[in-house]
């Protein structure tokens, strides 16, 4: 590892979107000296445009289509989405997904503890308060983790000579929030299925509780791998963007 930070390209420098080579001063009809990609494809022909949610369609159809694109084709989405400009719309998109994921995680946590582990022996107001507490804690954790990841990613980018300013990283992480949806749905599905089976015949399913806990632990590991992989897909396709 180098002992000093690498030089970060200037914000207005033109980078090759294929390899990151600085193209300043090269004519549009030439090619990148590093990888051979036509310079024009890193300029007006880069194919980047605002996400549907951001392009004046902040309604349910735009939200759903943008969510589908982020989840189904993350590399393509971040390769074709603009990285500059105001990030308020992206932040609202993230907040909606944090809220949805927090509801799903809170419900999964509630089912896991009160329906599976406690077997409905705890009644009264406590279960409702616990659900609301898990919801608030999850929402705050997702928000805080995003801000921390943005700071660390921008710092790492500067150290390694990547042009990843905080606003660009935040925009990417705000849209990356859509990936919490499949993770939270899987958590809810797993806990709900086991709770439903165990409630029908608690004695018969009691020996399988250990396997259920193993499965939940495996899901946590797989979710971490999935979230990091999609995070890197976002950063990799944004760090050479020119607009």
Language-model region placement:
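N-terminal juxtamembrane cytosolic/stromal segments of multi-pass membrane proteins
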Residues: 2-100
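Core alpha-helical transmembrane segments of integral membrane proteins
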Residues: 60-142, 154
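Short hydrophobic/aromatic-rich motifs at helix boundaries and adjacent loops
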Residues: 3, 46-50, 124-128, 203-207
